[in-house]
Amino acid sequence: MTYTLPELPYAYDALEPYIDVETMHLHHDKHHNTYVTNLNAAIEKHPELGEKSVENLISDMNAIPEDIRTAVRNNGGGHANHTFFWEIMAPNAGGQPTGAIKEAIDETFGSFDEMKAAFKTAATGRFGSGWAWLVVNNGKLEITSTPNQDSPLMDGQTPVLGLDVWEHAYYLKYKNVRPDYIEAFWNVVNWDKVNELFAAAK
């Protein structure tokens, strides 16, 4: 079995004006697709690895043969992270969090605004390429960031929200102003999906 590029769960222009259609085409059809292609190439001589979900694959990097471990880390992480990213966004979404995730955010951070501030710090403070995350770690919400295409799954944490802060995710529209992109992201967060992930992670 090989890994495949998932279709976007919405049209390429569905997240306009916050994420532009050209970026979505490049990000999904080119960048994400390249991670899938390179992951399949990496595991070609280890077909048993392709039987695992990509999330399971990257959750135990020590089980990956050493000669392909870096390639699987980078490309398996890229595939898992982007698949997750498309799913936690939606058109006509955003706004305030709801349900159990709202309660947990308020309890952990004090308010949604305080959580957004901490998330922004993680996202802007990530030097170079990487991701900012809201994760469940030992049953508690935490904000973290990872370099490159590393996933919280590699550290035993479960992501419930994530933002790609590689320049390819925002440069066409936001140029070098990463904070504007981070602010725009909150308009497309799919809180229903975040709640679903949060319920499964607890």
UniProtKB/Swiss-Prot annotation:
Protein name according to UniProt: Superoxide dismutase [Fe]
Organism: Enterococcus faecalis (strain ATCC 700802 / V583)
GO terms, molecular function: metal ion binding; superoxide dismutase activity
Domain of life: Bacteria
Keyword Oxidoreductase set for record: yes
Lineage, broadest ranks: Bacteria, Bacillati, Bacillota, Bacilli, Lactobacillales
GN (gene name): sodA
Alphabetic keyword roster: Iron, Metal-binding, Oxidoreductase
Cofactor names: Fe cation
Assembly and binders: Homodimer.
Cofactor note: Binds 1 Fe cation per subunit.
Pfam families: Sod_Fe_C (PF02777), Sod_Fe_N (PF00081)
